[in-house]
Amino acid sequence: MAKRIVEPFRIKMVENIRIPSREEREVALKEAGYNPFLLPSSAVYIDLLTDSGTTRYDHHGSMITGDEAYAGSRNYYDLKDKVKEMFDYDYVIPAHQGRGAENMLFPVLLKVKQEQGGAKKPVFISNFHFDTTAAHVELNHCKAINIVTEKAYDSDTYDDWKGNFDIQKLKDNIAPEWCRKRCCHYFSITCNSAGGQPVSMANLKEVYEIAKHHNIFVVMDSARFCENAYFIKERDPKYKNATIKEIILDMYKYADALTMSAKKDPLLNIGGLVCIKNDEKIFTLARQRCVPMEGFVTYGGLAGRDMAAMVQGLEEGAGEEYLHYRIGQVKYLGDRLREGGISIQYPTGGHAVFVDCKKLVPHIPGDQFPAQAVINALYLESGVRAVEIGSFLLGRDPETGKQKHADMEFMRLTIARRVYTNDHMDYIADALIGLKDKFATLKGLDFEYEPPVLRHFTARLKPIK
């Protein structure tokens, strides 16, 4: 039976929300081109679009200490000290968010690989690149290759580490001419596109050792690093008695750099980081890109108060009691749905419940976006906005223009941090379970407008008659 986890906080301020009428929702969805990204937030009752930047703060005290100096803000040096404490990395560049961090680092990795005499057909290899990460790889004329464990594709079967790299695939074609193509191994922790699934410490270590043997740089996408550390504590007996911060330090031994959207686990509404362990050349080249792309090197597109909040958020996000509640709330929603006969990626991950829409609407083919059809039905039924992680998000192959094949067609129910109560989780579960009899009647979708890059953000769709 689904178990509620009590919230480890008191509510000090509230925001009133309302459920738009069915008629209002129908009009809003049509005007949005059947793409919930284009809905105004006023047309949404419970917003499960993303956990990025949607956290509720308790950082306001630290924000008052913001030093808004253009150069040399003391908040930058506080942030640098916190990064050293948590990750043991020497070099820090702030960014306005995660994609800003990627935009500074990825071209540098390509440049360095080219200087080494390789990268004629450069690739980034990941357990699973998320959408903006893959876009930055492809905008740099590189290929994004995903090799998550095959266990991730079996949504009904429990496995502790569905975010792991497939080690055998990583070792395939490891000959020198293939290694010269690899700009980096890129860990996504937790692995968002596979269902917010964790990566084991053993997998981190093995991937890193393979990379170092072949002179390949390793980067950690660190949006949800605290959640990954919590899963390691819960599931790896070696770390049962370790603190979350001790586990984090061990995790980051197995990378050379990190990019971070601080809008997730560090509990911010804005912010990102590039951190380099000890490679001064990579740091210098990335910092050169900071000034024209993000801002001066000690603020990187952020106000001093945002860096002050990041220092606090990095600490709070690693709190074990908070993580127990956070991941427990997601599990509660997942358990409610499974008890109601809704297929999900099992076990639930750290930040969202991923509903397996291939099983809910098997009559809708991938190129008609089955998860998007379920998302729109849920919105019309309840005012709940979710997001698609499947064919619609994956987009087209930049070389052939053909739709990329999606092994998973997920509706992601993403839980904002410290925003919704367990009663909201029950409302979501009841609404989706109540749709079960309507799934067979849902129709697929086609494009009215398709942008060339990251199409799912601004595309307009129409129901197929």
Swiss-Prot record:
Pathway: Amino-acid degradation; L-tryptophan degradation via pyruvate pathway; indole and pyruvate from L-tryptophan: step 1/1. SUPFAM superfamilies: PLP-dependent transferases (SSF53383). Its EC number is 4.1.99.1. It holds the Pfam family Beta_elim_lyase. Its cofactor is pyridoxal 5'-phosphate. Keywords: Lyase, Pyridoxal phosphate, Tryptophan catabolism. It comes from the Bacteria. It catalyses: L-tryptophan + H2O = indole + pyruvate + NH4(+). InterPro entries: ArAA_b-elim_lyase/Thr_aldolase, Beta-eliminating_lyase, PyrdxlP-dep_Trfase, PyrdxlP-dep_Trfase_major, PyrdxlP-dep_Trfase_small, TNase, Tryptophanase_CS. The keyword Phosphoprotein does not apply. The keyword Lyase applies. GO terms for molecular function: tryptophanase activity. The modification N6-(pyridoxal phosphate)lysine is found at K264. PANTHER family: BETA-ELIMINATING LYASE-LIKE PROTEIN-RELATED (PTHR32325), TRYPTOPHANASE (PTHR32325:SF4). Belongs to the beta-eliminating lyase family. Homotetramer. HAMAP family: Tryptophanase. This is Tryptophanase. It comes from Proteus inconstans.
